[in-house]
From Swiss-Prot:
The gene is csoS1. SMART domains: BMC. Belongs to the bacterial microcompartments protein family. CsoS1 subfamily. Homohexamer with a small central pore. A CsoS1-CsoS1D-CsoS2 complex can be isolated following expression in E.coli. Forms a CsoS2-CsoS1-RuBisCO complex. The tight homohexamer forms a small pore which is positively charged. The keyword Transmembrane does not apply. This is Major carboxysome shell protein CsoS1. GO terms for cellular component: carboxysome. Residues 9-94 form the BMC domain. Keywords: Bacterial microcompartment, Carbon dioxide fixation, Carboxysome, Photosynthesis. It comes from Prochlorococcus marinus subsp. pastoris (strain CCMP1986 / NIES-2087 / MED4). It comes from the Bacteria. One of its GO terms (molecular function) is structural constituent of carboxysome shell. The lineage of its organism: Bacteria, Bacillati, Cyanobacteriota, Cyanophyceae, Synechococcales. It is found in: Carboxysome. GO terms for biological process: carbon fixation; photosynthesis.
Length: 103
């Protein structure tokens, strides 16, 4: 997985609650050509949604997701983009445990 995603941007939105997270994920995938790679239930009601794609697309998607999340209420906690995550980060992104999807 690491070789096919090297150089692809990572976008993250953290929300208070599941409804803003779903709203953000929907807006991000509709706004730009990005791939929804997962979600993480952080604890205390916080949810992080992650997308991958080209830097410009991820930037547009995260902006749209943050705007949509704010329309739901005070659900937006943080929004961030990493243009090219270091290769040491890639294994963590592909791990189901990290994404809250334990097998």
């Amino acid at each position: 997985m690491a070789t096919e995603t090297m150089g692809i941007a990572l976008g993250m939105i953290e929300t208070r609650g599941l409804v803003p997270a779903i709203e953000a994920a929907d807006a991000m995938t509709k706004a730009a050509e990005v791939r929804l790679i997962g979600r993480e239930f952080v604890g205390g009601g916080y949810v992080t949604v992650l997308v991958r794609g080209e830097t410009g697309a991820v930037n547009a998607a995260v902006r749209a997701g943050a705007d949509a999340c704010e329309r739901v209420g005070d659900g937006l906690v943080a929004a961030h983009i990493i243009a090219r995550p270091h290769r040491e980060v890639e294994p963590a992104l592909g791990n189901g445990d990290f994404l809250g999807q334990k097998d």
